[in-house]
Amino acid sequence: YSVGNEIQEIGTERGAEINRMLCNAFKELDATRFTTNGMNALNAVGAKVYPVMQELAPLIRKDAGEAGTNDNSGSNAINSFMKLMEGEAGDAFAVHPIVTEVLEESSESMDIIGFNYLTGRHLLEGELHPNKCVLGTETFPADIARLWKVVNSSKRVLGDFTWTGYDYLGEAGCGIFYYDGKSNFGSNYPDRT
C-alpha cells in the first residue's frame, strides 16, 4: 500500500509521525502487504533546501551549462531547483546529509522505501537500511537508462516507474513539455490562456 506521494510534510516530525501511523494502520488491516510512500526530497527538505543549493551551486551551474551566471532570479531559480532532480547535481542532492536527516524517520516506517527523482540515493539506502528494499516511484524519462543500471546492480532496488505520458495532450499544469526550445515545465502562450 502506498500511504502517499510527494507529501511535503513527510520531512517534518509531524509528517513522519503521520506516515508511521498510516503504515501501522495498513499493517493492522492487512499484514500480508508491504507499505511504501513516494518521497520527493525537494518537497520534504522545505527551507533547508537553500543551504544545500548553496553547497551544490557549482554542480548546478555545471549541469545547467551556465558556469558564468550568478543570477538566481526568475526562471534561473526554477531551473536551479529542477537541476536538483536530475544529473550529477541531482545525485549529489539525493545523498546530501540534510536530505538523509529529513527522510530518515519516514524511511524507517515503511517496508519499501519509495523515492521520486532520487536515483542517486538508491544504493545509499542499501547501506542505511540493509533490511529494506527501494523503489523508484517517479523518474524522468531522460534518466531511465542511467537509473536502470542502478536497478540491475542492486538486489535491494526493486525497479522504477517513469513518466511515460511525458507530452500527453491535455496537460494543464507544470508538466507541459515543449520540443521547440521553449522552457519546459511551465506554460507558454497559448497553453497558459
Predicted regions: what is each one?
Residues 1-193:
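Extended substrate-binding grooves/exosites of carbohydrate-active enzymes
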